[in-house]
A protein has these predicted regions:
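Short, surface-exposed loop/turn motifs at beta-strand boundaries within globular domains
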Residues: 70, 84-88, 101, 151, ...
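Intrinsic disorder/low-structure terminal segments
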Residues: 12-13, 123, 141, 199, ...
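Long, hydrophobic alpha-helical transmembrane bundles and adjoining juxtamembrane helices/loops
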Residues: 3, 25, 38-65, 74-77, ...
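Alpha-helical interaction segments
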Residues: 190, 258-260, 318, 781-782
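Noncatalytic modules at the cell exterior or secretory-pathway interfaces
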Residues: 86-92, 141-167, 207-212, 258-279
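Surface-exposed beta-strand/loop patches in noncatalytic accessory domains
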Residues: 25-72, 96-147, 163-193, 216-259, ...
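Generic N-terminal leader segments that precede the first folded domain
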Residues: 68, 73-84
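Cleavable N-terminal signal peptides of Sec/SRP-targeted secreted and luminal proteins
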Residues: 3-21
Length: 824
């Protein structure tokens, strides 16, 4: 009897509750006509009854419903796989609820045959910013491999529920996206927000093997562009977009080159996601209070175009090699034309009296104004006329061992005599043995060759690892390419930027060959006319020239390694050998007229290593304190080098230096106002003024790119020294040969054009990856090279011509006596 009563009560309650649910739905959404089925659990107690409202929904219809702790709503979309949907169509679901809370959100679960998708409203991104309206595109099952949906009835179930005690209203809709596919060479516009990501499908047309996809926007709101395989699920939220495919952050523009061979179905998804903040794109972030997020809607345009064919790769490669091969042809022609105009034949034309003149006579004349010397020193230092026997107890100057001049007490006195004369000539600073000096300068290129091997191998290993990480993770923010002109080949993502450094290598090798040819001619000259050659022209030592050629080759290798994956972590690979080139050029200019007192190789390379170390510290830890310390060190080093150059190495730093300076100031106060070596003093005064200005500017302005700032200092000093050397050469009555003048003018043109392309700023590693991409530009040469690649070509030519200037600048002095060639 009791059981019968309970069954009757259950039926009554079921009918009553169903009528209440229908009345509520008709009240909330009276304008929508849909089929409703209500189900109640028959086993629970009355207070725990749970109601499920099933709605047979239609696409394009908006539903306004309520949910609470005791109810849920299931929207069912039934369709035919052939008639209703196809590969060009996708379904997009939108849910909004302004009354939902973080503690009791509206939960949305979408069930499809291939998987499920779920989210909550409000949607909290980064656990801070709340979005009360969410739109998601469902993964199209028709795009999946091995899909058997043709001629089959399909259904999509959307469950909406909430754990809120009070009724929570929400709005729900699902619509078809008929233009889901991106078309080739057609612009497509889209609107994206953090809670409303978008993605579209692109399918490679026939005969198209690679495409470049460009995304542009006028807004700088930060977003992510992701390329993913055709598979479910599609990762279209900020928290999971990094889990699949490749991606870039974007502010105003992004670009990706994609190859059909990397995708099974020759198709992919382009996923657009707006980030809740701009830190990843702009490097700064405006602080916002937690809670409702501000509007971050971004309008973007998407364009897909075909990339260059493989034939264009061959054109770009062979054009570059052919261009630099022209320099080899020109060099060969010039060498053939000047084959009969070498120095050895010209020396034969010098009269016997001019060749046999006693150099001690000119030495005494040139030093008479400074003070007298004993006759023994004059005899000791006078060379022997060819064919004449060497007097007993006397040694020829060219047979003096270097240790005799460097360590003996008498030799130190000779240094003080010769190097402190008011009028110095090259003969005064070319007294060491030619054989010993040649060995000393050979150390430069052998040491640099060793440094290049030990420095280059780890660099190559590191950048290859970067390239592998880029491919494995898909994070294209790792490398700062010009994505609008990045042509991959093999394992390299940007082959053109790597290959464009071929000019440094080819021209560096050519310069080494030219130096070797000149060195061979000089060795032949020494063998045939050694006594004559020793007294004429600038002393020829080619070790620094070989080192310059090796440095140019290594600049190409290191720059190529850097451009495998250019970023903040490996910038020094591209600049380290530029510092070395600048230092070697300055050392070579100084060595030309100071062959006996140039810096030793290990000292020079140690200083260059300290410069590179300082560049790294300046980029990583460029604080205000660092800039102050750097400015002080810069000015102090400038003074030390000035003293070393001014006194020709005849001074030393010890604990008595300040005492000596005080005595000089007290005893020769008036003479201090009139420098003894005016030319040197003027050069050093101008050089110190410029370097101090650089140091003060750095301490005050604190440039963001310390590496470029430091390189500018070295280049500025090198240009200043070259200009001074040429001016002093002309003021001394010396001439410059026409071929050297032509190369000087040509190098000015090439340097000007090279700097024009250098300042195009296509990328910048001291910005964020998205900020760097704002400067990306299309290719400008052969549809293969961008402006920075042209900079590589032009700067390689400019450096090569600059090296030739140093090699040929003093050729007019080959027939001039060394005791008549002034030192400056």
């Amino acid at each position: 009897m009791v059981v019968s009563v309970l069954r009757v009560l259950s039926v009554v309650l079921f009918i009553g509750t169903a009528s209440q649910g229908s009345s509520a739905n008709n009240t909330l959404d009276g304008e929508v006509d849909h089929h409703v089925r209500t189900v109640i659990s028959p086993y629970g107690e009355l207070k725990n009854d749970f109601q499920t409202l099933v709605v047979e929904a239609e696409f394009g219809t908006t539903y306004r419903e309520i949910v609470d702790l005791k109810s849920e709503i299931v929207f069912v979309y039934s369709f035919n796989g052939t008639k209703d949907l196809n590969e060009m169509t996708a379904v997009r679901v939108s849910v909004s609820s302004v009354n939902s809370t973080r503690s009791s959100p509206v939960m949305v679960v979408v069930r499809q045959r291939e998987g499920i998708m779920s989210w909550a409203v409000p949607l909290f991104i980064d656990y801070i910013y709340a979005y009360y309206s969410v739109s998601r595109t469902l993964c199209p099952i028709f795009h999946l491999p091995d899909s058997d949906t043709e001629d089959a009835e399909e259904a999509i179930y959307v469950d909406v529920s909430s754990m809120a005690v009070n009724a929570t209203p929400f709005t729900f809709s699902a619509e078809l996206l008929p233009n889901f596919e991106l078309r080739h060479n057609e612009m497509k516009n889209a609107t994206v927000s953090p809670s409303e990501p978008q993605y579209f499908m692109y399918k490679f047309p026939e005969n198209v093997t690679s495409v470049l996809i460009k995304v542009n926007s006028d807004s700088k709101t930060c977003m992510v562009v992701s390329i993913q395989e055709i598979r479910c699920p599609v990762y279209d939220l900020d928290r999971n977009v990094e889990f699949a495919g490749k991606y870039q952050t974007m502010s105003t523009q992004a670009a990706m080159l994609l190859q059909a061979s990397n995708y099974e179905r020759r198709a992919f998804y382009v996923v657009l996601i707006v980030k809740p903040f701009d830190l990843d794109c702009l490097g700064i972030e405006e602080i916002q209070t937690s809670g409702a997020a501000i509007s971050r809607v971004k309008n973007v345009s998407i364009f897909v175009e075909e990339t260059i064919p493989k034939s264009q790769y061959f054109k770009g490669i062979f054009a570059a090699v052919g261009f630099f091969s022209i320099f080899y042809v020109i060099a060969l022609v010039v060498l053939c034309c000047f084959h009969r105009c070498n120095t050895s034949q010209s020396l034969m034309d010098i009269s016997e009296s001019e060749r046999d003149i006693d150099s001690s006579h000119s030495f005494v004349q040139s030093s008479a104004s400074y003070g007298s010397m004993s006759s023994n020193i004059g005899k000791e230092m006078s060379p022997v006329v060819p064919g004449q026997a060497t007097p007993p107890g006397h040694r020829r100057v060219d047979s003096l061992d270097e240790s005799d001049l460097d360590f003996l007490h008498d030799a130190n006195e000779e240094k003080d005599i010769f190097r402190t004369k008011t009028a110095l000539f090259v003969s005064d600073l070319a007294r060491k043995s030619r054989k010993k000096l040649s060995k000393l300068y050979k150390v430069y290129h052998w040491n640099l060759f060793t440094i290049a091997i030990f420095y280059g191998l780890p660099v190559a290993q590191l950048v290859i690892t970067y390239q592998k990480v880029l491919v494995a993770t898909g994070n294209e923010d790792l490398c700062y390419y010009n994505f609008d002109c990045a042509h991959p080949l093999g394992v390299l993502s940007c082959f053109n930027s790597v290959f464009s450094n071929i000019g440094y290598v080819l021209l560096g090798i050519l310069f080494i060959l030219l130096v070797w040819h000149r060195d061979s001619l000089h060795k032949k000259l020494v063998r045939e006319h050694g006594d004559v050659e020793q007294r004429f022209g600038i002393p020829q030592h080619f070790g620094l020239f070989y080192a310059m050629g090796i440095a140019l080759v290594m600049e190409g290798v290191m720059s190529a390694c850097y451009h495998v994956c250019p970023n903040y972590s490996n910038f020094q690979f591209d600049t380290s050998f530029m510092y070395i080139i600048a230092c070697l050029c300055m050392l070579k200019i100084y060595q030309s007229r100071h062959p006996d007192i140039n810096a030793k190789a290990y000292q020079a390379y140690l200083c260059m290593a300290l410069v590179i170390f300082m560049a790294v510290i300046g980029v990583v830890y460029a604080t205000g304190l660092f800039w102050i310390i750097y400015a002080i060190v810069h000015m102090f080093v400038s003074l030390l080098l000035s003293a070393q150059i001014y006194y020709m190495g005849r001074w030393q730093i010890d604990r008595y230096i300040f005492k000596r300076l005080w005595y000089v100031f007290v005893t020769d106060c008036l003479k201090c106002a009139r420098p003894t070596y005016r030319d040197r003093f003027f050069l050093l005064l101008v050089g110190n003024a410029i370097n101090w200005a650089f140091a003060i500017y750095g301490a005050v302005q604190q440039p963001t790119d310390f590496a470029s700032y430091l390189l500018a200092i070295f280049i500025g000093n090198l240009l200043l020294y070259c200009l001074f050397y040429i001016l002093m050469k002309l003021l001394s009555g010396e001439k410059i040969k026409w071929i050297a003048i032509f190369i000087i003018l040509l190098s000015m043109v090439t340097w000007g054009s090279a700097l024009f392309f250098f300042f195009s700023h296509l990328t910048s590693w001291h910005k964020t990856p998205a900020g760097s991409r704002e400067g990306n530009r299309p290719c400008i040469l052969l549809e293969f090279y961008d402006a920075h690649d042209v900079w590589h070509f032009m700067s390689a030519v400019s450096l090569f011509l600059s090296f030739l200037i140093l090699l040929l600048l003093d050729d007019d002095l080959s027939l001039k006596r060394r005791d008549r060639i002034p030192v400056f």
